[in-house]
Amino acid sequence: ACDTSDIRLSRDIFAVATDPDIDILVELIGGIETARELVLTAIKNGKHVVTANKALIAEHGNEIFQAAQDNGVDVAFEASVAGGIPILKSLGEGLAANHVNWLAGIINGTGNFILTEMEEGGRAFDDVLAEAQALGYAEADPTFDVEGIDAAHKLTILASIAFGIPLQFSKVYTEGISRITTEDVASAAHFGYRIKHLGIAKDTGNGIELRVHPTLIPKETMLSAVNGVMNAIMIDGDAVGPTLFYGAGAGAEPTASAVVADIIELGRALTVDHDERVPY
């Protein structure tokens, strides 16, 4: 068992952000304004930050990153997109030698669960949404999931890393799935397609196109085979071609996996002994 006897507890989050004995602050409280104030306070007090807060990064990341640069600290946010899939590190490091032509992904598990059940069970949107809420996949207010806002937050972050552009959440064309009917899904299937709710970012040559909307995908493509609450992101690079990343995009354990990975990476960077950084 893990010994937790020396762990200090505090009811004051800002006391944590200003404590000189703390090197890394991990923000998992959600929301935007309080989280923004907490993160900026930690940064201004010389602390590295780990967060899973996609809304915070998508809407205030430019300000946060500038503050981090000014104060010589890092902000890690792998868990903000696609849960346990290490997509941000893959884009920023593993595919760094590529020019990304486009990326497209199923990046909201709730919406994908709803569309999958509508197709496979012939069920109405409202019926499946109620089940998703009962299973804990959707919130009591499902607006962010079914109207594409959650996916737009994630796409904003993906595009920033893929194309080296500032975060531009306000410029994402966003359309949800709440108007999709059982008849729509059946008609798509009749013609050899599936309806998937995609986040798409594309280098058009004249700029970066950012959009989230329901999309007809041929059944024989890899993205069309992604069912339930799973996530998948396909990235087309000039050197590697189309590359698919697939896995659990949400949930406590996949998210925790990404958060802890960021903590470990920052911890290694704080270690002066190079021997601690070898991969074995």
Provide a role label for each language-model segment.
Residues 14, 40, 65, 88-92, ...:
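Predominant activation on well-ordered alpha-helical scaffold segments within soluble catalytic domains
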Residues 29-45, 52-94:
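Rossmann-fold NAD(P)-binding glycine/threonine-rich loop
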Residues 69-150, 157:
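Rossmann-like NAD(P)H-binding beta-loop-alpha module
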Residues 128-225, 230-232:
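Substrate-binding/catalytic subdomain of NAD(P)-dependent oxidoreductase enzymes
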Residues 1-45:
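N-terminal glycine-/serine-/threonine-rich beta1-alpha1-beta2 phosphate-ribose binding loop
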